[in-house]
Amino acid sequence: MSKKIAVLVTDQFEDIEYTSPVKAYEEAGYSVVAIDLEAGKEVTGKHGEKVKIDKAISDVDASDFDALLIPGGFSPDLLRADDRPGEFAKAFVENKKPVFAICHGPQVLIDTDLLKGKDITGYRSIRKDLINAGANYKDAEVVVSHNIVTSRTPDDLEAFNRESLNLLK
């Protein structure tokens, strides 16, 4: 049986931070479900990549999935303006399911009180936000802290994908 990975994504995501992990997960036999505030629409990445949204966040539950991916770009900042994406991500962490967040992706976790004491990385411009949320910020290509995998930039995708897949085993 194929595992399902939820992907929280909206307009202005960093294209390669969506396409590269999704390709890695699909090649490893996982199915991916794109989730935004409303289903059926198409969202566009910063460089023109199009993603059709499969499900609205109000129609899904973390228990339906085995892991969560949060790509970076401006998408996480737009998503966190609504409480539901953070609550959705919080359910994964609390249920010890993997959460993969790259670049600005950890922004979705900032308001959840889940970062306290965890080693986390992310894009340098959100470093202070992560520290203020209680995270131990690490400037490393990939950081694995319990069930959360984080990376800084698209340059870190190889390590990010590798550690994400390792956590899924």
From Swiss-Prot:
<comment type="similarity">
    <text>Belongs to the peptidase C56 family.</text>
</comment>
<keyword id="KW-0378">Hydrolase</keyword>
<feature type="active site" description="Nucleophile">
    <location>
        <position position="103"/>
    </location>
</feature>
<dbReference type="InterPro" id="IPR006286">
    <property type="entry name" value="C56_PfpI-like"/>
</dbReference>
<dbReference type="InterPro" id="IPR029062">
    <property type="entry name" value="Class_I_gatase-like"/>
</dbReference>
<keyword id="KW-0645">Protease</keyword>
<dbReference type="InterPro" id="IPR002818">
    <property type="entry name" value="DJ-1/PfpI"/>
</dbReference>
<dbReference type="GO" id="GO:0006508">
    <property type="term" value="P:proteolysis"/>
</dbReference>
<feature type="domain" description="PfpI endopeptidase">
    <location>
        <begin position="3"/>
        <end position="169"/>
    </location>
</feature>
<dbReference type="Pfam" id="PF01965">
    <property type="entry name" value="DJ-1_PfpI"/>
</dbReference>
<dbReference type="GO" id="GO:0008233">
    <property type="term" value="F:peptidase activity"/>
</dbReference>
<feature type="active site">
    <location>
        <position position="104"/>
    </location>
</feature>
<keyword id="KW-0346">Stress response</keyword>
<protein>
    <recommendedName>
        <fullName>Putative cysteine protease YraA</fullName>
        <ecNumber>3.2.-.-</ecNumber>
    </recommendedName>
</protein>
<comment type="function">
    <text>Functions in the protection against aldehyde-stress, possibly by degrading damaged proteins.</text>
</comment>
